[in-house]
Amino acid sequence: MEVKKYIQENEERFLNELESLIRIPSISAKTEHKADIAACAERWKELLLEAGVDKAEVMPSTGNPLVYAEKIINPDAPTVLVYSHYDVMPAEPLELWNSNPFEMVIKDGRIWARGADDDKGQAMIQAKAFEYVVKNGMLEHNVKFIFEGEEEIGSPSLNAFLKENKELLKADIILVSDTSMLGAELPSLTTGLRGLAYWEVEVTGPNRDLHSGHFGGAVANPINVLCEMIAKMTDENGRITIPGFYDDVEELSKEERDMLASIPFDEEKYKAAIEVNALRGEKGYSTLERNSCRPSFDGCGIWGGYTGEGSKTVLPSKAYAKMSCRLVAHQDHAKISKMFVDYFSSLAPECVKVKITPMHGGQGYVCPITLPAYKAAEAGFEKAFGKKPLAVRRGGSIPIISDFEKILGVKTILMGFGLESDAIHSPNENFSLDIFRKGIEAVVEFHKNYKG
């Protein structure tokens, strides 16, 4: 059966299966969702068995369980390892959602729910493409699946799992759908990702919250001090001020800059979509260069003092912030993390104490476009979307990708189908039904073209 017809005839079932996953709030960041994490893993096991794998199992790790499945056609044939994650980000702030984030809604040609894109929707693309090639006798290579439940918290258990199961996960290429395209009419293959380093900072002043009338102006306010310290992290040119931070940053070649400049990009539409009047970043680089190929520093959260209803004139004892750096290829996240700890600590005046807790991080990644698997993915996009995809680096991070290469010795093809407008990690996450269909078609074509 032709793939478009198969998708059309089975779409209601596909969406019902996706809904069965979305109903499970598999939020890895919250310990109260441990049972949901386990339930989602079990549901994926069932769905992969129904799709045609020979075996599937939920495997324990030092953290959340992983789902492993395989279809072995021939032990001597090439093997594709499909990676995804079944955990999702918290849905807060709930009041900004137009519908229940864990009740899937189909509206305006889009799927609306937490996980609709990241990554339950994109994982379903992989599962249904696999189902099609198996049921139609087109699969000529082995396929393995590994779905984890901790990607949204930095995959803390996956590294050890990879080391302990190298033989089980042995493959010739890894296929991932957890990235985005440049646009619905502008398909693209991700050839690079930024790395990540992340910290939580606690600034302490007095030993208790104080009356701001009695102590204000005489005692340092930790919130004020923390804001001053954060402000010193970048200079007037948008560059990060940590000494030595840029030592390992590889400058973009003229060819790369020319390629990025050739991408159709409307800066006014970009600003309008996120409702900002102007853009800001590192001087000397375009927006597309800044958000994909250059490092960045961001405050991700800041709090302290009284945040309840009404007013309370208080000089707080403590202030907190969460901060991150997106890193580029060749920057080591552990090295950068230590540099940040040393530098940020040095910015603190003697009137406060600073505690810095490094959190999750990961390396950047670059994929050669000469790989046979890349060419197969390229053919898949061209078949489904009617045009050859652009090869672009993206600004997001999937920390485990570099570990795949380091531990398993295998490159990864980042064959993602999301859009910036999908609002992943935000209220009203959504995923285009048209792209969902085309994604299945593209991955089917990948399997038909990949010869190892």
Model regions: which residues?
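N-terminal helical capping/dimerization or prosegment-like subdomains
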Residues: 1-94, 318, 335
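An extended, acidic, His-containing surface patch that forms the Zn2+-binding/catalytic region
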Residues: 183-184, 241-318, 326-342, 347, ...
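A short core secondary-structure module
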Residues: 216-237
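Acidic, glycine-rich active-site loops and adjacent beta-strand->loop/helix elements
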Residues: 86-88, 110, 146-154, 177-181, ...
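Active-site metal-coordination/substrate-binding segment of hydrolases
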Residues: 77-147, 438
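Acidic/histidine-rich catalytic neighborhood of metal-dependent amide-processing enzymes
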Residues: 117-192
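Flexible glycine/proline-rich, aromatic-decorated loop/lid segments
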Residues: 188-204
